[in-house]
Amino acid sequence: MRQDIILKPWQIELTTNSTNDNFEESTFFTGNGRMGIRGYLPFWQEKRTFETGLFVAGIFGEIKPGITDFVNLPTPVWGNIECDGHPITLSSPVSSTLDMKTGVRSQSFLAKSGESTLNIEHHVFCSMSDPSLLVQRLSFSASRTSNISVHAGIHTACCNCPVPDDQVKENHETIKLAEPAQHDMCKDSVDCTFSILGTGLIVREQMFFHTSFSDSEDYISDDSLGKQWHGILQSGQKLVLEITTRITTSRDIDPLIGSNEISDTYDELFAKSSLAWTSRWSESDIEIDGAPDDQSAVRYNIFQLITSCSARDSSVSIGARGLTHTRYKGCYFWDTDLFMLSFFLYTHPEAAKSLMEYRVRTLPQAKENAKKMNNAGARYPWMTSFDGSEQCESWDIGASELHITADIPFAMQQYFDATGDENFHLQAMEVYIETARFWYSRCIIHPDGSADLMFCKGPDEYCGITNNNLFTNCMVKFNLDLAIKAALRLREAYPNRYSKLSLCDEEVLAWHSLRDNLKECRDPQTGRYLPDETFTRLEPVDIKTLKTDDGASYHHVCFDRLQRYQVIKQADTLLLMSRLPKKFTLEERLNAWEDFEPCCLHDSTLSFASHALFAAQNGLQEAAEKYFKKALYLDLHEIMNNTGKEGLHLACLGETWSSIFFGFLGATFDGDTPVFSPVLPSGWKALRMNFYWRGESYRLMVFEGRYSISRI
């Protein structure tokens, strides 16, 4: 756990003596949604080939046949400084600042070389006005007149160290996924093209340099290329080097790419990017009175959701770690659809549509995946990357974590309900129908009409391979209901589409029967809901014997053993009830909390926020606030001791936002007008925010339990 980040209204700050603090590198990530860069210290002689972290959405390379990794690209945020012919050494702590209002990360420190002390500052941002631009400014001064040498360019030796899917295994073998194909050196620029292993993708990095210090010379070595400058720096004189890099790829579709000039100055590009950030914050900010640390942390969560969403590119989604790390090979999970979508849906509907269109685009791969599993229709893979094919290498998870195929139609319907986007709804209807076909072929339907869903896992991955997981079965029923309504709508209004999908009344009636007869597990004595058929047969255990802090228990308890204890990894039944609250009575929801909250290990970073949301929705304010604090500061305080090692947890960021909007603010959208029932966390005196609903923008203000809402 860490508590050394200083929180300010629009900034976070950290001072450290380390030049390679992976916690800082994760938390001080900055980006623009299309690309981003971890908060490592540049212009330092230490070369960390796989630990830097420059990522562009959708750029994956093949590490084995059919399996990809998120490419750690050759980074232009790199260089070194020499003074009087000697490398510099750190002589003060490194001070880092992340400005969330503008996306600029700043780092400053003192360095010594011989008798000279250098005061070094570095600023970097990824432009929000032109998502292909990465902009830097390096400046430093010397305590005495010194002979200075500066190298800047592209660290071409960057590589990947693929992280195994298994959370208790480690890998130390690296693989280079971006090979230089060609380069061109001009007076004030460097242009280098890289080919990505196995996927045929091309990445181009064009660097433009501006400094008045001296003329540049070309610099090429085995692991880098760029420019170098030599000259005398007078005592008190400041050397300023501005570097703008345009990063383009062979798969770009964002219309804003190339909209700014690479030759513009740092200040000119900063002004344009800041204007775009101002617009984005006007849609997304949550203003809180009375809780300054929470205010900063909420803005941090929002900032990091924005910086990992390529809002205008529907060929990509958001990985479990966004653009902040290669954990889980950068793949897209159900995290996006169930935990992140709501934030974008109510603050940036265009981005939400893009995320849903990614699932429409990959429907053919989902159909192929179902076919491989000897099923009909479409089964969405558990983990996907650039082409929508299955990337999960854990056979039990990949084969049995079926619920994603129902989660995606659920998310699509959420998008339609909030926007009324009829054109998208027509596309979504095909997804509803093809996924319903999968469920009908995957379930076991008995002669009496009853049905079971066998060999599955719900969100609680500690249940072993089980039968009739309640979360999955109820989401399947929701999916089937969507398909039934879609089929009727197509038959009446779009008969050609109905015919093209080979629909018939008999198939739709079969979905009716499955929806009505698929099993929901209950305790035969009490009638209370159960997570699945096997939960009560597992061995009870005092969870205090399994863990003593908020770190995951699987680091010291064998995973096989965890599968046989009566414990829950993360919200499962409670998650279902937060997503489909109308299906359950308040008594049923509170009974579920009483039954399952005490035995939850919270071994997933999804869990705290989901419990906060459920508790806030159901009047459990004290518990809601307890879990909300853990979720809100999960990364900023490294609550689970894995932020530095694995990157930021985007699903937690998204669900934390939902715990505010749907939990503490009590947002509901049953009719044409949004309704709220706010109960703010302790210390929050007032709250203000904007949101979208069905094409309208609204302003919400909450004060002392009252609220007002107005159209903007």
Enumerate the predicted regions with their spans.
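Helix-terminus loop motifs that line ligand-binding clefts
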Residues: C309-T324, E350-F410, F416-Q427, Y440-S450, ...
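Carboxylate/His-rich catalytic cores and anion/metal-binding grooves
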Residues: W78, P87, A291-R299, T336-P381
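Acidic/polar, glycine-enriched structural segments that form the non-catalytic walls/loops
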Residues: M1-S26, T30-G31, M35-Y40, W44-R327, ...
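Alpha-helical scaffold segments in carbohydrate-active enzymes
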Residues: Y300-T307, Y358-Q365, V431-R442, F478, ...
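C-terminal capping/lid segments that line or modulate ligand- or cofactor-binding pockets
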Residues: N22-F55, F339, D387-Q391, I445, ...
